């Protein structure tokens, strides 16, 4: 089945938003079961084009969005949290005329998808969570040691006169803490990241009532695969699929396998 991929823009709450919509050829705009995909931190709709096309061939209207602050969408004017992004998604689906839809969220996008679904279960027909963030753990010994070391590096760079050397020390400190995304973020988005990584959604998992598929790569080094089993234990109508050989981005590493799992779940 051939598909048509369109890139579009709209303004919501003063923010210019970019999104992509793929629909099977010959189908009128707005027709067909819709699937909305929310990307992870530091990514954009572009990273989902391959999977978007594959799922479109299965007959779905697939929409990927550049969340505010990513890709070609403007950043929010204030420091947003997960709730703000969830509210934004509500405005977005209303603006493009989706009443009920399937929802897929990856990593940070999974955090948003969880928050949105809990509050709008009447809108979400089925939920796919791909290595979602949202579970906070107390730091272990390694993390505590790295935190202390990163603080030392930060103090060292303050005493260095060269700006280029300062940047190197700062980058090293954030990388040690696995916060290179924070280092790369600019302006308000740095504070957005600081806010969202502190948000723990564990207490709301059990409130999800829609059928849910949890997908994880067994080689995920960013969000531990053990979290998958926490989710399926807490979410009433959920199942888990672990993709062998995939890391944190199965939509890029193993797109065919992810497409098969998603399609099977949506058609069940």
Question: Model-found features: residue ranges?
Answer:
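Conserved HGGG/HGGXW glycine-rich cap/lid loop of the alpha/beta-hydrolase fold
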Residues: 15, 22-25, 29-72
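Conserved acidic catalytic loop of the alpha/beta-hydrolase fold
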Residues: 83-101
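Gly/Ala-rich beta-loop-alpha elbow adjacent to hydrolase catalytic centers
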Residues: 105, 109, 113
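Flexible "cap/lid" loop of the alpha/beta hydrolase fold
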Residues: 114-119, 124-157
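Conserved alpha/beta-hydrolase catalytic His-Asp/Glu region
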Residues: 140, 155-209
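Short beta-strand/loop motif that positions the catalytic acidic residue
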Residues: 208, 214-216, 220
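Conserved alpha/beta-hydrolase "acid-adjacent" motif
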Residues: 221-227
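Catalytic histidine-centered segment of alpha/beta-hydrolase-like enzymes
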Residues: 246-255
